[in-house]
Amino acid sequence: MQNKSEKHFDRIRSFVLRAGRTTAGQQRAIDELGPEFLIPFQENLLDLQHAFNGSSRPKILEIGFGMGETTAKIAALRAADDFLAIEVHPPGVGALLKVIGETHLTNLRLIRHDAVEVLEKMLAPNSLDGIHIYFADPWHKKRHHKRRLIQAGFVKLLVSRLKPGAYLHLATDWHNYAEQMLLVLNAESGLTNTSAEKISIETFSGADVASDSEIAKDSFKEFKPTLEQLQSKHSGYVERPDYRPITKFENRGIKLGHGVWDLVYQKKS
């Protein structure tokens, strides 16, 4: 049962519905493999061990797996872990189920639903050994930054579901979003940045700092840096962990001249 004392943060969706047609092969995978590997959304807590046929292996959550190539590769590489992967788009769900069938992966389960509601309703506090969020929509335009997934309220929800000592791994190919992630996550008291490097903020300026009138509003939840953050050095990024393969999004970003930033945090004990 969900802890009623938990404060539900202002609604932010983990996804945007996009057009895309499910192929016959993807639909076949959903029909044939869905009953075994696709977990329906429910309003009560999921028994993670039961969901993986009694497995007591560490449980890793992935939010937004796209077409599932990276998820499948990581699950195959890390056979000693179980992976619960969330995606809303049927073509991606079908594509990953198809790979599961072709490669006989047994340590992977999928949920097709909004990740925020899955975290709130289905996953118990202190139940996860790790969380992966790779290449979430950066919402490039400044007026859309409020739609970005990595905001303080959502991060608190993530941290609450991690076990003490568990990790949170994010990656993005958009520098400004990387810096927002960094500032939001570094400010979360329940997390420790595992990076040894120190960096300065480059993509935000004084014009982005929240005004006193904005801060005074109870409804103001959008991330904006403080002047102190812009003037300080911060614990930074890490090298891409070996278990995360280079994705098509990463290659696309590199071709466009973008960098790729990995952030890894550990929940404090």
Model-identified regions with their sequence ranges:
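Conserved beta-strand signature within the Rossmann-like core of class I S-adenosyl-L-methionine
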Residues: 164-172
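Conserved class I S-adenosyl-L-methionine
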Residues: 144, 171-188
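Class I S-adenosyl-L-methionine
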Residues: 183, 188-269
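A short glycine-rich, Lys/Arg-flanked "PGG" loop and its adjoining helix->strand segment in the class I
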Residues: 150-164
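A short SAM/SAH-binding and catalytic strip from SAM-dependent methyltransferases
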Residues: 128-148
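A short acidic, Gly/Pro-enriched loop at the edge of an enzyme's catalytic core
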Residues: 120-130
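SAM cofactor-binding core of SAM-dependent methyltransferases
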Residues: 58-117
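S-adenosyl-L-methionine
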Residues: 1-61, 69-72, 76
